[in-house]
């Protein structure tokens, strides 16, 4: 049975993340390998795994949502469009090793923005993550969003959509975003009720408890500052609960 895993990490880069950002970056860097290694202990294999990073802050303070490319941690069904240096790849045991190194390098080079508010545009980032170009191959699939923040999210109903860095096609209410998750839009290829998973590392501030209560397929960890080791287990159990 082929098993395909996509993970989109959404990382708040507001300045108040400073005290935990190094732990989070280590967590993100190590999580794909942890998933593979732990799954292999069950005598099973992941056919294809991709990961990408989205960073967000506060639009009012000039921080846009930024997207990385997909990094092919394992398996290369779509690797033909990868523009990596072939000479460098030839010195590494495999292209997946190269991609893992590039992924970790990208994560390590994430820097925080200076800002003065304790709110961020986490809901807009979540909306864009839902619309990721998810892989549609494989007999079994997991499409996972992991969001890290210490902030309350700005309300969609109060967003200033005239700011030039504000993305297009963002829901205008939390209810509309909820519907987008529960009933994925047609352009979101591969995302289904069976494949989707949302993992929230955020405090008990708006809207994270509300999302945990109203959305399906959600794991919520309000103790992101303290529980990284336990969270690894939460992620694994979430991804492989019915595989």
What are these regions (language model features)?
Residues 2, 44-47, 136-141, 190-193:
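Extracellular/periplasmic catalytic domains that process cell-envelope and extracellular macromolecules
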Residues 13-17, 58-61, 115, 150-155, ...:
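Solvent-exposed loop/turn segments at secondary-structure junctions
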Residues 151-212:
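VWA/integrin I-like adhesion module and closely mimicked acidic/polar interface patches used
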Residues 215-243:
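C-terminal "exit" segments of structured domains
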